[in-house]
């Protein structure tokens, strides 16, 4: 079995693959303060809950946009799994033709999503990932990663509104009853939700205009289903796009080793 870790700024998503099947997946908080032992015990409890042991895992791969956490995670893999994990970064084979001015600036999560997106859906392709930041990636009809856009995530914007506006409360991100809010909470929900739907449709439509062939639009991330339910431009919601990409990269980089 292969253990994959997608480390985001807010949450870390973990998955166990048995062949091509994602057997188990979990979401835990990303904490820069945790030690390798704390991460090890957290993961041990998750594995034990589904009847697995550290020894059931034969390979590991990590994608991270939080560099300070990597020391603890790599130590955890070595100490508890006795495995040196693959790290998505310089030196790993991706098969991507990246047209960024500096390819090293492309986040690991965006690379992993692009690998999975091309494999599953072909090209051209637009990938929208609703994470701590909302990222947009454009892959042209030649399967070249052309770049994209990065915007503040929905939760960041909501928290900023709460923090900077004295009379506005912290709210749940949810669909309001009406676009015209009748109270402060519903008005904020309408502004946040439909403001982001407008952002998605505006950016995606402009990216589509650059393509000679209509690109498929894939959304992933925790709030993708909510945004997709209100948007006309998203074709597919794939909640496990990043985990799929990690599995594919693991296979690409270990195939000669059997």
Curated annotation (Swiss-Prot):
Residues binding ATP: 6-13, 132
Cofactor binding summary note: A monovalent cation. Ammonium or potassium.
Binding locations of K(+): 129
One GO CC term on file: cytoplasm
Gene3D superfamilies hit by this protein: 3.30.420.40
Pathway named in the protein's UniProt entry: Cofactor biosynthesis; coenzyme A biosynthesis; CoA from (R)-pantothenate: step 1/5
GO biological process, one term: coenzyme A biosynthetic process
Pfam families: Pan_kinase
Compartments in which it is found: Cytoplasm
GO molecular function, one term: metal ion binding
Broad class of the protein's primary localization: cytoplasm
Superkingdom to which the source organism belongs: Bacteria
Biological role: Catalyzes the phosphorylation of pantothenate (Pan), the first step in CoA biosynthesis.
Xref: PANTHER family: TYPE III PANTOTHENATE KINASE (PTHR34265:SF1)
Family of the protein in this entry: Belongs to the type III pantothenate kinase family.
Quaternary data: Homodimer.
Protein name from the UniProt record: Type III pantothenate kinase
Protein encoded by which gene: coaX
